[in-house]
Amino acid sequence: MLFRSVFTMGDNHKPANIAKAAIEHAQKNGNNLVILDTAGRLHIDEDMMAELEEIKNTVTVHQTILVIDAMTGQDAVNVAKEFDEKIGVDGVIVTKLDGDTRGGAALSVKAVTGKPILYVGMGEKLSDLEQFYPDRMANRILGMGDVLSLIEKAEAELDIDEDKAKERDRKSVV
């Protein structure tokens, strides 16, 4: 199981102190993975950037992943560039690609930062996080659609329906 608990200290604490306490809490409880999720930003906010720098200076961070909203368009490039310059980004997740956004910002972010796009968000659930495939994104941007992802989703649904049918058949024999 990936998520065991959520650590919180409330709103009246500095983010760096919360990060430090969260890691200490995880270590005491035998957790070997801590995800520090900070406040979202659609534009550069100097105070929030300073908070991120303070977190990186307070705790040992093994990987920094920037989550970009595809609907912000080309402004995502400015955000990604600033984040990478200020705190260093190891990879990118692009969200909200389930709408009518084509995702051109994703490739621009990759070009500007040189950092890999790790995943794309195709909905609001954790299960809607999909591995990033550059060729599929290129087809989407060119208006050709993402036929392979559509086929994979259909196959997954067929597998689920087949499993349900087998279970139903098994129960009817009893």
Regions found by a protein language model. Name each.
Residues 49:
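Active-site-adjacent beta->alpha loops and helix N-cap segments on the catalytic face
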Residues 39-41:
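Short glycine-rich anion-binding loops that position phosphate/pyrophosphate groups of nucleotides
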Residues 35:
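Active-site beta3 strand of CheY-like receiver
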Residues 5-11:
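Conserved donor nucleotide-binding strand/loop of the catalytic core
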Residues 19-23, 27, 31, 43, ...:
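Conserved phosphate-handling catalytic cores of large alpha/beta enzymes
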Residues 11-13, 70:
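Short, acidic/glycine-rich phosphate-metal binding loop used to engage nucleotide
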Residues 1-2:
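Short, small-residue-biased leader/transition segments that mark boundaries at the very start
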